[in-house]
Amino acid sequence: GILSVVKELLRTNIVKSNGAFIKLEDLNKDDYRLNKLQLNNKKREFILYAKENKILITQSDIRQVQLAKGAILSGFYALLKKANIDMNDLEKVIIAGQFGAHVSVDSLVGVGILPKEVNEKIVYVGNSSKTGAYMALMSKNARKEMELLSEKMDYMELGASLGYEKLFAHCLKFPTN
């Protein structure tokens, strides 16, 4: 998917750590990347597929990935800080949801959605909300346990957290090779 493409664009230095495409004029005339980049209304685009129905990756596509990456990573760091937990103390990082089951660890870490330090700790659990709903419907004990757990949960407004804007801005940067 798009994360795999962005990871490769970063790896090949077609996209810089700030999320911008490299400039065509900065490439040598024999650079293979020249054939994969084009200008369209003064905006750079990457040609993913060039046959009859072109598939392009635009600067806007990269920015959308970058914003999602910044939100997820900054939320991850903010939660660690609030819980006063060091990243090295994490036993596992659980990825839930149907979407998460289709995203590789390589892409999550390669794009910087999650830090490389948790690479070996990532565990996929599938559609946990659906499983939880089934459990709540089928078991009074499970439902009671969920109710008790919900009373222990705390709400955290990321945007209102001290220093969050700076953290978010820092987390927008893509990892470098």
Regions found by a protein language model. Give the residues of each.
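Helical "lid/coupling" subdomains associated with nucleotide-phosphate turnover
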Residues: G1-N177
